[in-house]
């Protein structure tokens, strides 16, 4: 094993994904955990100090079943007793749309209590900085919007279903597999919700498999025995051979909060049997998460991850539809051209596209001018960039159409306060060819 956390990060093949649990939300937002959240809503149903203990006993201390019982009782009381309703538009709108009042109120409760803990301001700022160039993406079971708040520009998938049915780029993305407060209906909290989640877990695992095999995964804010982690890992392990399972050891990093360690990181190995196979992962123990984040600044993507995702998304859509967009221009090329002679240019489209006009063929020019073929160039652009090169090949170019277009554009000698001097097309051509 490497000597330090910095050494481990240095050996990462790429920037990591962070798998974020409720522990991070508790740390930075001081929000309640699962049990505390259920207790809060149980207390709204009844002022009996033993109400939650009753739910615990009647449901075998199973939080999923307790969630179902509280949801049923809360919804019933919410419709009968207006005094327990939160008089806010987002709550009423959600209920009117068919969302359970329990989930609508829960989402609102988390929203209004999501206040950053200033004691961890430096940690939060450092983590936010990492989202620019040092983290590939996030996977989380949290409902709150902490990650979206710090990772501006990331694409967010607000539910397991949305993730399963969407093309993902594995870059600058947030996968909220248990739902989000921005969509209360998506929140997974009852036994029925979890059953539906488990039924689709194999599909989710298939969607995440490439990420788990190609990216380092840092689990943070979870207990190592967390059921959510166990279920997802179990579904993923079921897809892998022992050889590939063994590869996960160097890619799985588990951060364990240890209140006694404040100025160092204790590095060890943790093993867990899943599906009959021993899974090993690197374990980091500390209560100073700055020590976790700082070495990650040394592992950078080639360019900001938001841009990388944008490019991947554009190429994916073009490959899928064969339709260029305002962000991607694809010129016809000989399929027999060696790959090492092809290039991809990235830059401001207004400049790159005009440079591409220099290589316009005669056929393309005729189509653009005579048939108004759809090309996003002005007559000025064609004259300035394409015509000089084409005139060296032939003098028979249909320039009249360009002249008409230019004269229409210059119908006034003044545009935006700038005095324009009219010239004939012939004069313009002579000036650009000279």
Indicate where each model-derived feature is located:
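Conserved catalytic-core helix/loop/strand module for nucleotide-ribose chemistry
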Residues: 1-189, 213-215, 224-227, 232, ...
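Short acidic alpha-helix that forms the nucleotide-activated donor recognition element
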Residues: 210
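Active-site glycine-rich loop that binds ribose-phosphate moieties when present
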Residues: 122, 192-207
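Active-site loops and adjacent core secondary-structure elements that bind or stabilize anionic groups
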Residues: 221
């Amino acid at each position: 094993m490497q000597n330090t956390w910095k050494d481990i990060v240095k050996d990462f093949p790429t920037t990591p994904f962070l798998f974020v649990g409720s522990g991070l939300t508790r740390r930075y937002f001081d929000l309640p955990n699962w049990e505390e959240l259920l207790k809060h809503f149980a207390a709204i149903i009844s002022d009996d100090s033993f109400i939650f203990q009753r739910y615990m006993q009647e449901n075998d201390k199973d939080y999923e079943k307790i969630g179902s019982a509280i949801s049923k009782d809360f919804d019933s009381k919410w419709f009968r007793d207006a005094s327990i309703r939160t008089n806010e538009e987002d709550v009423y709108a959600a209920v009117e749309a068919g969302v359970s009042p329990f989930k609508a109120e829960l989402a609102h409760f988390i929203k209004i209590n999501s206040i950053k803990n200033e004691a961890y301001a430096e940690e939060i700022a450092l983590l936010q900085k990492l989202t620019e160039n040092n983290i590939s993406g996030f996977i989380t079971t949290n409902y709150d919007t902490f990650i979206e708040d710090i990772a501006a520009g990331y694409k967010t998938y607000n539910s397991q279903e949305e993730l399963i049915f969407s093309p993902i780029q594995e870059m600058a993305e947030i996968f909220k597999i248990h739902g989000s407060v921005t969509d209360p209906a998506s929140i997974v909290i009852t036994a029925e919700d979890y059953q539906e989640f488990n039924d689709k877990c194999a599909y989710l695992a298939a969607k995440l498999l490439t990420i788990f095999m190609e990216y380092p995964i840092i689990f943070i804010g979870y207990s190592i025995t967390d059921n959510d982690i166990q279920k997802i890992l179990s579904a993923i392990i079921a897809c892998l051979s022992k050889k590939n399972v063994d590869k996960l050891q160097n890619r799985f990093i588990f951060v364990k909060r240890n209140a006694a360690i404040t100025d160092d990181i204790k590095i060890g190995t943790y093993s867990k049997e899943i599906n009959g196979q021993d899974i090993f992962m690197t374990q980091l123990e500390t209560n100073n998460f700055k020590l976790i984040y700082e070495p990650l600044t040394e592992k950078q993507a080639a360019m900001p991850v938001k841009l990388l995702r944008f490019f991947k998304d554009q190429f994916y859509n073009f490959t899928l539809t064969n339709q260029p967009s305002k962000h991607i221009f694809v010129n016809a090329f000989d399929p027999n051209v060696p790959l090492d002679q092809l290039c991809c240019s990235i830059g401001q489209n207004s400049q790159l596209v005009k440079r591409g006009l220099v290589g316009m063929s005669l056929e393309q020019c005729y189509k653009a001018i005579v048939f108004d073929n759809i090309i996003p160039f002005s007559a000025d652009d064609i004259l300035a960039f394409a015509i000089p090169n084409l005139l060296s090949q032939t003098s028979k170019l249909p320039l009249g159409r360009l002249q008409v277009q230019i004269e229409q554009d210059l119908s006034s000698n003044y545009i935006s306060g700038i005095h324009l001097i009219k010239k004939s097309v012939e004069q313009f051509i002579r000036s650009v060819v000279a």
